[in-house]
Amino acid sequence: MHRAQAKVILDSISPEGIRLTTVQVRFWRPMLPELNTHRAISKNAGSSRARPSKAIIDQVRNDPWGPIHWGKNQAGMQAHDELTGWRKWACQQVWKIGAKSAAAVSWALWRLGAHKQIANRPLETYTYVDDLVTATDWANFFALRLHEDAQHEMYDVAKAIKE
């Protein structure tokens, strides 16, 4: 699956010596609520309602986003162990079937005349979001998200921003 991508848009230091960094980030959309828990970071994410349905349907059909770590079910919030062999492969195939199914549902809604704010929703699990994030203090974010207990996909977002 896809890895998070980040690009520094603006990095400046005020006369008082405060550094302000703005980063454009593209990442797996289900990680957006995780990023939004960090109140010290200003965020402006792209909306599913702003993207044409056909464009998202085509992207999900041909190039779905999803997990980069196929964690094995275990107690707790962390999936440190990863599935292997045929189980991992089977999960990846099921994920692709889910993406095709979501694309079919969205296509039907779109063709029936539903607005993209409705037609695009089934696709969100299988697509990306573009977000513009700005902060003066990234320490807490990196301490939590570049940690071994962070969800792998959120770790990937933090790593892309830090690099």
Place the predicted regions along the sequence by residue.
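A conserved ligand/cofactor-binding region detector
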Residues: 1-163
